[in-house]
Curated annotation (Swiss-Prot):
This is Ubiquinone biosynthesis O-methyltransferase. SUPFAM superfamilies: S-adenosyl-L-methionine-dependent methyltransferases (SSF53335). InterPro entries: SAM-dependent_MTases_sf, UbiG_MeTrfase. Its EC number is 2.1.1.222, 2.1.1.64. It catalyses: a 3-demethylubiquinol + S-adenosyl-L-methionine = a ubiquinol + S-adenosyl-L-homocysteine + H(+); a 3-(all-trans-polyprenyl)benzene-1,2-diol + S-adenosyl-L-methionine = a 2-methoxy-6-(all-trans-polyprenyl)phenol + S-adenosyl-L-homocysteine + H(+). It comes from the Bacteria. The keyword Chloroplast does not apply. GO terms for biological process: methylation. It is an enzyme of class 2 (transferase). O-methyltransferase that catalyzes the 2 O-methylation steps in the ubiquinone biosynthetic pathway.
Amino acid sequence: MQQNTNVDPQEIAKFERMAETWWDLNGEFKPLHLLNPLRLNYIDQTAGGIFGKKVLDVGCGGGILSESMARIGAIVDGLDMGEEPLEVARLHALETGVSINYVKNTAEAHREDHREYYDVVTCMEMLEHVPDPQSVIQACCDMVKPGGFVFFSTINRNVRSFVETIIGAEYLLKMLPIGTHDHNKFIKPSELIDLVDNTELICKDALGITYNPLTGIFKYTSKVDVNYMIATQKVD
């Protein structure tokens, strides 16, 4: 059963239009392909390894993170509301021989039959694209087992993030299609932690990610002024 109350149709349509290029390493999702090894390593290391664990990837899109987690032995469900990205994800998994269960649904609706079901839940680059981030965070909390980990990543809201992610990445470097992001929907780390604190999740770690346009390389950084991830754990 789908609950569409926490879905922005314009956001869904935006990624539907880009779906065909999801696995083009030099296409519109090149930044995600470059960023993904850092995300995967952070998730795997912080969660104490995800091999053999049940993992839910909320807002999975075309499956970049989902596939990488499945490749290192996780049992992955990928969740998204975009039909085209999910079709791309299913086809790519079939072509590469990776077993992933992709589902078209919201986190809130998926929760109905999956309370405390997953060992790990990931919600990466997704919160800034929904009307109510708190609702998604609560659903993620409800679906992870006590003691399990939930990972979030998003973009800080300040002048630097506006310059780097919108003016730089969208207009100057053409790394992303113009209109991919809305600066007003970016979430400050303090705001995200406040949202997390409203649930049974506890923030265990925060880590920034920086991009060097000259080398084309993403790196970890202690600064969370633009892209950042947080690791949370459900109270046991």
